[in-house]
Every structure is written in structure tokens, then in C-alpha cells.
Swiss-Prot record:
The keyword Oxidoreductase does not apply. Coiled coil: none annotated. GO terms for biological process: isopentenyl diphosphate biosynthetic process, methylerythritol 4-phosphate pathway. Keywords: Isoprene biosynthesis, Nucleotidyltransferase, Transferase. This is 2-C-methyl-D-erythritol 4-phosphate cytidylyltransferase. It catalyses: 2-C-methyl-D-erythritol 4-phosphate + CTP + H(+) = 4-CDP-2-C-methyl-D-erythritol + diphosphate. Gene3D superfamilies: Spore Coat Polysaccharide Biosynthesis Protein SpsA, Chain A. Its EC number is 2.7.7.60. It comes from Pseudoalteromonas atlantica (strain T6c / ATCC BAA-1087).
Amino acid sequence: MSTAPLYTVVVPAAGIGQRMQADRPKQYLTIAGKTILEHTLENLYAHPQIEQIIVAINPLDQYFDSLPIASKTWVKRVDGGGERADSVLAGLNSLQNADWVLVHDAARPCLAQDDLSKLLATAEHSEHGAILACRVRDTMKRGNSSHDILHTESRDNLWHALTPQFFPLDALRSALGQAMAQGIEITDEASAIEWVQGKVHLVEGRSSNIKVTQPEDLHLAEFYLQHKATL
């Protein structure tokens, strides 16, 4: 009987979360007695195929080292950069002897374990990367700079990109490096792979896998965390 492969997750956590309008970076805000970052890391490590998490932290960060989770043997800290892509690349460059790697947002604490399992299973039958995503359900409008509607976009084949995103390590590291060297804006790892004409598969996941961005998201994330066994 073969053993399931083990993987490392890179978590970029060097951002300051200005939209949250809080007194600290959003990953250090508390939900249900723990910081968002602690929920995120513990949730990832709870999966039996995750063996290590590399957290990219702002070098001037004053919060991470005081968290109990910072001393866990399965957590490795690296210095992050000014942009998400810089932090992800720092995490990737610290990796050795890995074929595949996951990248997950620090502010997504509500990832479902079976969604993560579905994503990891793609490595068993594909040489390409994949991301968790959920289908667009609302009517989508294209607007102009004056906030006037130009037209309605078709929802067919439109998806919300989520994380984790899962790629061969060398392919992702190369794509990020090339895109950054050309000054391309990288909003997620898939966009770097797309830029080098790589193939990325969509794995449907739950819409409850939200990214905490606005103040009202804190209450929604707390609800999902408290009810994750039934969602």
C-alpha cells in the first residue's frame, strides 16, 4: 500500500491589510479566541498530507513571534517582501527537495479539509497546476470609471479564484521570477503561470473559503469556523 505524498504550504503573511482599518495587520485580528493566522495555519496542518508550512513575515513584524504557533516545529518563518509575489518567492526559494508546493492566503482561515484533499488529488493525475475556485453566482456587470453599467457579463465559465493554489515547485518559481522581472502585476500564483502560457486546472471548492478583507468579514469567518463541521 503506497503512502500518500506530503506537501509544504507557503503562506504569504507580510501584508498590512489597509482595507480592514484596524490597529494591526488583519492576520493578527482575533476570531474565536485565536488570531486569523493561527486558525489558518492550524487548519492547514490538520490535513494529514501537510508536513510543513513556510510563513513569509514582514521583517518589521511585531506580532508573529509572540504567537504560540511560531514555535511549532512544522512552522518555518522567512522574511517576506513588499508585494505578495515577493513573499511567495521568498518562501519558494527556501524550499529544498520538493516537487509540488501549495500557496495559501494568510487571511483564509475557513478552508474545508475535503476541498484541500480534492486539490491535492490533482497531482496524482496531472503534471499541471490547479487552484481551488468557486463558480460565480451573482449577475456580473461591467462598469466604467463613472460607475455606469456598460453591459452584463455572461456568468458562463466565470469563477472566483480561491486558495490554496497548487503547482510544481520549479514551474511556479520560474513563472513568478519571469513575470516579476517584466514588471507584470501578479495577483495570485495562477496569474503568473497563465502569463507564461501554463495550464491551470479549476477545482471547485466551497464559497465559505472566504478571504477576510473587510471588517464585516470577521463575523462571517467566525460563523464558518464555529459551524465548519456542518458546512
